[in-house]
């Protein structure tokens, strides 16, 4: 028995010695945060979870814009599933999103995690499946009828609901959570635009709509899959426990709601996206089945709700802390409305801005772009590495590993945006005369709307929606943060405010000085 114990002890010592040597050489190659045996940099990531994006930015500053780390320091695993290359170098981002686009798909882990919610929809697919939907959607997003439909939904929601809620808050001197209101507004709008059915979550009593609640639950449960190993969430799914049980039940509600919407549009087509996809055929000439239509619609709902509402929330937070920017926005609004509606300021707030009026708001667009530079709605994205590759800065990325590009960090690098990169300065987006909006010459230093073949199709609609909502609030009210309210980032794929954005409102009164 002692001999057996001695042999086992010898094997264990030898294995640990080999592991220690392997770990030594691996850790010397890793340029990012410190890694520990077996668990890698995971403890430091967890310790910094409340400021995860700033922590990543700190590491990128210290390493010149790119670093590599492991979250599973185990032989034969560390070079693939647990290996991450993190970058904010614009040339690397261009390489990933454009030059070697096919080498950096969503990847199997991402597709598996989101499959139950998004199926093979445009935001959860690669290759030919993605390309077919992209081409179809691209045609629809260039039509004027879609722009008109969006304007109708946005302005109707502002006039008939948002203004009523804000007016009541002013009368009662009660605070409101702008983030919650914007989430409800954009959810109602994107549902109306996508399948012509308004869930009316933005109403005076701020109701809990079953579809909205189920959609939120399904989204949160799906995001948890990315925090677990595939094995763990699949076990939960098979056993029907934990977040997987919530996901299953919420998806049943979502699918019932979507089936009703699809049936309604089959019987009465309109100008929404679902009606347009109902006319499409697959590669074999067959109509798209109901489950495919469900997932196509849900993909657009997911993309169109959170991004604009989160951007608007951070916009108002920045404006409240930079009153000189607010003054310039209101002055620009007054100049445009004086030309389009005359000198009577009461007429300026009778109706929300038309999209044609919003198109003329150059400074407001610059302020929104500056918001997205500092607080991008999607702060980082992940890509799977199909084949070994070398990034433009010389970093080798092994196949099977993950590449993360930090959009949040790009906007906070002095080497990219200059010494004033942390300042909220909309003027950086304008031509020297201040007359025109100007995108950066290096397009990959601003990828808040993605870039390359996956550039956001709804970018222009998103800007117009945000300009309409921002102007609707700023023309009528002055906004002040609730004393003591803490604005913090939530650890999520979308840059939500953890505690919302609670504010008081005051009537603006005369706009012109």
From Swiss-Prot:
Induction comment from the UniProt entry of this chain: By abscisic acid (ABA), the ethylene precursor ACC, mannitol or cold treatment. Down-regulated by auxin and salicylic acid (SA).
What GO molecular function terms would the record report?
Answer: alkane 1-monooxygenase activity; heme binding; iron ion binding; long-chain fatty acid omega-hydroxylase activity
A cellular component term, taken from the record's GO annotations = plant-type vacuole
Q: How does it sit in the membrane?
A: Single-pass membrane protein
Disulfides per UniProt = none
Cited Gene3D superfamilies: Cytochrome P450
Membrane spanning segments where?
A: 7-27
Predominant location: membrane
Keywords of this entry: Heme, Iron, Membrane, Metal-binding, Monooxygenase, NADP, Oxidoreductase, Transmembrane, Transmembrane helix
Q: Which Pfam families match?
A: p450
Which reaction is recorded as catalysed by this protein?
Answer: an omega-methyl-long-chain fatty acid + reduced [NADPH--hemoprotein reductase] + O2 = an omega-hydroxy-long-chain fatty acid + oxidized [NADPH--hemoprotein reductase] + H2O + H(+)
State the needed cofactors, names only. heme
**Where is this protein localized, as stated in its record?**
Membrane
Tissue-wise, where is it found?
Expressed in roots.
Instruction: Write the Enzyme Commission number(s) for this entry.
Output: 1.14.14.80
InterPro entries linked to this entry: Cyt_P450, Cyt_P450_CS, Cyt_P450_E_grp-I, Cyt_P450_sf
> Which Gene Ontology BP annotations are present?
fatty acid metabolic process; suberin biosynthetic process
Which residues are listed for heme binding in this entry? 456
Top-level taxon:
Eukaryota
Q: Which family does it belong to?
A: Belongs to the cytochrome P450 family.
Q: What does this protein do?
A: Catalyzes the omega-hydroxylation of various fatty acids (FA). Acts on saturated and unsaturated fatty acids with chain lengths from C12 to C18 but not on hexadecane.
**What protein name does the entry list?**
Cytochrome P450 86A1
């Amino acid at each position: 028995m002692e001999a057996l114990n001695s042999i086992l002890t010898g094997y264990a010592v030898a294995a640990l010695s080999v592991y220690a040597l392997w770990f030594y050489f691996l850790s010397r190659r890793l340029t990012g945060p410190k890694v520990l045996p077996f668990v890698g940099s995971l403890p430091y990531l967890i310790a910094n979870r409340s400021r995860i994006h700033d922590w990543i930015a700190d590491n990128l500053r210290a390493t010149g814009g790119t670093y590599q780390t492991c979250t599973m320091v185990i032989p034969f695993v560390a070079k693939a599933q647990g290996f991450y290359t993190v970058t904010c170098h614009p040339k690397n981002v261009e390489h990933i999103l454009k030059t070697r686009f096919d080498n950096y798909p969503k990847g199997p882990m991402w597709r598996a995690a989101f499959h139950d919610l998004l199926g093979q929809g445009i935001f959860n697919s690669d290759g030919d499946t993605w390309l077919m939907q992209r081409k179809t959607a691209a045609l629809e997003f260039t039509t004027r009828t879609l722009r008109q439909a969006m304007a109708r939904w946005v302005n109707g929601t502002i006039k008939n609901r948002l203004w009523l809620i804000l007016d009541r808050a002013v009368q009662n001197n009660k605070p409101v959570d702008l983030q919650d209101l914007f989430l409800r507004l954009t959810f109602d709008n994107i549902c109306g635009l996508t399948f012509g059915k308004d869930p009316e979550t933005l109403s005076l009593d701020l109701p809990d709509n079953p579809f909205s609640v189920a959609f939120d639950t399904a989204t949160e449960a799906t995001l948890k899959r990315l925090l677990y190993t595939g094995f763990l969430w699949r076990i939960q799914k098979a056993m029907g426990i934990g977040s997987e049980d919530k996901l299953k039940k919420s998806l049943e509600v979502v699918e019932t709601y979507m089936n009703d919407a699809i049936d309604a549009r089959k019987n009465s087509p309109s100008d929404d996206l679902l009606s347009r996809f109902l006319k499409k055929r697959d590669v074999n000439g067959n109509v798209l089945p109901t489950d495919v239509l469900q997932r196509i619609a849900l993909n657009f709902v997911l993309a169109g709700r959170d991004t604009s509402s989160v951007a608007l929330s951070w916009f108002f937070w920045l404006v409240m802390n930079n009153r000189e920017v607010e003054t310039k926005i209101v002055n620009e609004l007054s100049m445009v409305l004086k030309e389009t509606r005359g000198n009577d300021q009461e007429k300026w707030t009778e109706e929300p801005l038309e999209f044609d009026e919003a198109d003329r708001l150059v400074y407001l667009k610059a302020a929104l772009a500056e918001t997205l530079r500092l607080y991008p709605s999607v702060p980082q994205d992940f890509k799977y590495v199909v084949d070994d590759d070398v990034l433009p800065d010389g970093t080798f990325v092994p196949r099977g590993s993950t590449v993360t590009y930090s959009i949040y960090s790009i906007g906070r690098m002095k080497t990219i945006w200059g010494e004033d990169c942390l300042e909220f300065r909309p003027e950086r987006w304008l031509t020297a005369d201040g007359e025109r909006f100007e995108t950066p010459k290096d397009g990959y230093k601003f990828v808040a709307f993605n870039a390359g073949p996956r550039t956001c199709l709804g970018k222009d609609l998103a800007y117009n929606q945000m300009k309409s909502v921002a102007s609707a609030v700023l023309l009528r009210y002055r906004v002040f943060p609730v004393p003591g309210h803490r604005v913090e980032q939530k650890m999520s794929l979308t840059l939500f405010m953890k505690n919302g954005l609670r504010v008081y409102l005051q009537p603006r009164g005369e706009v012109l000085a």
